[in-house]
Amino acid sequence: MAVNQSHTESRRGALIPSGESVLKQCEDVDLCFLQKPVESYLFNGTKKGTLFLTSYRVVFVTSHLVNDPMLSFMMPFGLMSDCTIEQPIFAPNYIKGTIQAAPGGGWEGQAVFKLSFRKGGAIEFAQLMVKAASAAARGIPLGSVNYWFDTSGLYIITVPGAAVCSSQTPCPAYPIVIYGPPPPGYTVQPGEYGTPPEGYGAQPGGYGAPPMGYGAPPVGYGVPPGGYGVPPGGYGVPPGGYGAPPGGYGVPPGGYGAPPGGYGAPPAGYGAPPAGNEALPPAYEAPSAGNTAASHRSMTAQQETSLPTTSSS
């Protein structure tokens, strides 16, 4: 734990070691010490300010409007113990615990701290602090992406949803400034887009400029085969599976030509012949010349025998 080593020169922000992430920020928090170290005036009274939770520690920054000798107070998870959350009826919820002094931290011994959340959020802060401490102990610290960096290498973290801050346009409230190189994997400021990834290059061959009213050709449709001209208006690209007509549906085979002579239009009163009776079956072909004469003599004899006989009066 260190005293007066974690605040900016203007006392409007917190100094966070490089590589750590700010997980939560709470304003209007009161800090007091129920048990103070011996011979240290820095721990007297109640301090008002902003509380920050990072991947490895808790940092309290006293408000720049308050005249107090303790400007900042930093507590690493490894030096905190006996932390509890209290919910009094007529007072804000608070977190209480014991903190040990760190070598070179500006004080010696131990103290019992009390963090009161006047605007609420004590339970959420305590729960996240327990998760962060457990993750840090396993060597897998919690991370956050709520930071920004500019060309100077200065990191400025703001409340989620706030405007982006920079060295030219500082935040009006409590930015958190992080000194050091950018974390691994962050080399370009968000909002700048470089070369598109592989696979998003030029349009493949075979696709020219689409005609008016036609969008980009869908994937899987190449150049149409020969014999297919420009599609008529209102018709797009034919769906898949409709290629050339299958074999067998071309010119009709021999034997189905024009009907034989003598079969012209039917007499009046007869409609069109039913479907399937267009061609004569093999047994109903035209008779030969000899059969025609014999048939004519037979018909004449039948007519003569069937005529009635005339009787004399």
From Swiss-Prot:
Tissues in which the UniProt entry reports expression: Expressed in testis.
Keyword Repeat: yes
Residue interval(s) of motif PPxY motif 1: 183-186
Record domain GRAM: where: 8-87
Record has Repeat as a keyword: yes
CDD domains per the UniProt record, alphabetical: PH-GRAM_WBP2
MF GO annotations: chromatin DNA binding; transcription coactivator activity; WW domain binding
Annotated Sequence repeat ranges: 179-185, 193-199, 207-213, 214-220, 221-227, 228-234, 235-241, 242-248, 249-255, 256-262, 263-269, 270-276
Function: May play a role in meiotic resumption and pronuclear formation, mediated by a WW domain-signaling pathway during fertilization.
Name of the protein described by the UniProt record: Postacrosomal sheath WW domain-binding protein
Disordered: annotated segments: 254-313
Region (12 X 7 AA tandem repeat of Y-G-X-P-P-X-G): 179-276
Biased composition annotated in UniProt, kind: Polar residues: 289-313
Short motif (PPxY motif 2): ranges: 281-284
Skewed-composition ranges (Gly residues): 254-264
One GO term of the biological process aspect: positive regulation of DNA-templated transcription
